């Protein structure tokens, strides 16, 4: 998430096995703008950008993994942009449930509504409508 006018704005969810790289840091060597909040007990492994770049140079398989990771992140960013511009809040909710079937059991509704770009009241209405 990041902050807009002192309010948390969620723009990404991760799950087991996902890699977390602030792309601003990885590619521009600048501090990222995002904050990471773990909602469940987790184990994290840290790898410096310099070490990752060394691994890219040392192993083509790791370099290809990094390229594919970046490609997936670009696609996710584009999908989020398209979703926010052209889909209704109901469609965005349905997409989220399709992508993360157990999200309602794992993430507070306030965070989900932030991700969808709607109020928690609007989210409650959507959920009531499709029950």
Would you name each region that the model predicts?
Residues 77-88:
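Short, Lys/Arg-enriched, Trp-marked, Pro/Gly-tolerant hinge/linker segments that flank
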Residues 3, 41, 82, 101:
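Generic anion/oxyanion-binding catalytic loop in active/binding sites
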Residues 87-131:
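Phosphate-/nucleic-acid-contacting segments
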Residues 9-68:
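Cyclic-nucleotide recognition modules
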Residues 67, 71, 91-94:
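Short, well-structured alpha-helical segments
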């Amino acid at each position: 998430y990041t902050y807009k006018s002192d309010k948390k704005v969620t723009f990404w969810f991760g799950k087991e096995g996902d890699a977390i790289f602030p792309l601003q840091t990885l590619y521009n060597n600048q501090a990222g703008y995002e904050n990471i909040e773990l909602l469940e007990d987790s184990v994290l492994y840290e790898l410096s950008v310099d070490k990752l770049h060394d691994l890219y140079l040392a192993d083509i398989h790791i370099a290809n993994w990094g390229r594919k990771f970046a490609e997936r992140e670009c696609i996710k960013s584009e999908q989020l942009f398209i979703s926010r511009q052209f889909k209704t809040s109901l469609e965005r909710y349905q997409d989220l449930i399709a992508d993360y079937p157990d999200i309602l059991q794992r993430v507070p509704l306030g965070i989900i509504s932030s991700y969808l770009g709607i109020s928690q009241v609007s989210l409650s209405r959507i959920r009531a409508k499709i029950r």
